[in-house]
Amino acid sequence: MTFDTMKKLITIAASLLWGAALFAQQALVPGSGIVSPEINADNTVTFRYYNPKAVTVQISGDFLPSQKITYVMDGQERVWEAPGKADLVERNGLWTFTTEPLKGELYSYTLYVDGQKTMDPSNIYQNRDIATWTNIFTMSTEKGDKGWYYEVQDVPHGNVSKVWYDSPTLGTQRRMTVYTPAGYEKNTKKKYPVLYLLHGSGGDEDAWSDLGRAVQILDNLIAEGKAEPMIVVMPNGVYFNQAAPGVAVNMFQPTITNSRSQSTEEVEMSFPDIIRYMESNYRVRKDQYGRAVAGLSMGGRQSAALSRRHPSMFGYVGMFSGVVPPEEDDKALEAVFAAKPKLYWIACGKTDGVMVNSLLLKEYCESKGYPVSFYESEGGHIWRNWREYLTIFAQKIFK
C-alpha cells in the first residue's frame, strides 16, 4: 500500500468517525430540528413538541387566561393567579399550539404530557422560581416596550458578581448578587448610589437577576439615560439559608410556605452587615440619599420594616406587593417620614391579595399628611408586575 493510499484511507476513516460522533451528539440533543417556541410575524407564538406515543399534550403559560386560586395566608384570604392551560393539536406525532398575538414581555411556560409536567426539549432557556422550573422566552414588538427592557440590547453592559460576605450578626457566611453598572471599573474616582433589592418568600439571591431581569432592566435604563448609574445589591433574604440551592453548605428544598422565612426581624438586625461590606469593598455613597431599598412580597415587607428600624438609612423605599400594615398610632412610621425620604413608593396589582394592606398603608399615610406615592397595575401577585415595578422605581431614585 502506497503512502498516498494510506493517507486517503485515514482521511476517510476520520471523516466517518467525525460524522458518527456528530450524529450521536445530535441524537443526544432532544428536539433537534424542531423550533419551539417560534415568534411569528403577527406576534403570535407557536409551540411544537414531537411525541407520537403521547395521548394528550397541554401547555401551561402566563400568556394564557389565568386561573384564579383562592388561599388563606396570615389569616387573610388571597388570590393567586395561576397560569392557564391549553391543548396542543397532534398531526403525525407533532403536537402544536399557537397563541393569540402577544405583547412585549417575558413569558414562562411548561408542557404536560399525559398529565406529567415536562420541559420543552427544544427550548434551552429555563428559569427557577423557588422550587419550580419553567421554560421562558422574551419578545418585543417595538423598542421601549416591556419585552425590550427585559432583553439584552446592544448597549454598554454592567457586571454581575456572586459575592460571599461575613454576617457576624447571623454567625455565618452568606451570598448575594451584586450588579455594578457599565463604567464602574473605569470611573475609579466616582462613588455610586446603591439599590438594595429584596426577593420574595422562598426566593434567594438569584431571583431578581434571573426571574426579575434586573440586570437587563438596569443596563437598558442606564444606557437610555432614564436611570442613574447605580449598584444593585440582591441579598438572600431568607435568614436561615446561606445561599441559593446548590451553592449553600446544606441541601434543602426551597418552599414558599415556610413560616420562618416570613420573619423580618433577623433581616432587620443583620442588614447593616451587608451595608458595611458594600461600603468597605465597593465605591459607594454612604449618605441616606445614596441608598434605596425595595422588594417584592416578603421583600416589600422587609423593605418597610428596615425603613422603620433604621429611619435614616434609606432615602428611597419601595414596596412591591408587600407592606407592613400601619398601627393605630404608628410611631415607627412617623419616624420614617421624620427622616424625610425622597420617595416612599407602594405598588400593587388590582387583583393582588396584598392590595387590602397596601391601600390601608396608603390611606394611613395620606391621613397623616405623609408624602406617599401609590402605583396600581393590572394583575396579581406575579413576576410580570414586579419587573414592571422595578422598571418604574429605578427611574425615580437617586435624582
Task: Describe these PLM feature segments.
Residues 25-46:
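N-terminal edge beta-strand
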Residues 18, 30-32, 92, 236:
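Feature targets compositionally biased, intrinsically disordered low-complexity regions
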Residues 39-399:
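Non-catalytic cap/lid and distal C-terminal segments of serine-dependent acyl enzymes
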Residues 1-27:
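Bacterial Sec-dependent N-terminal signal peptides
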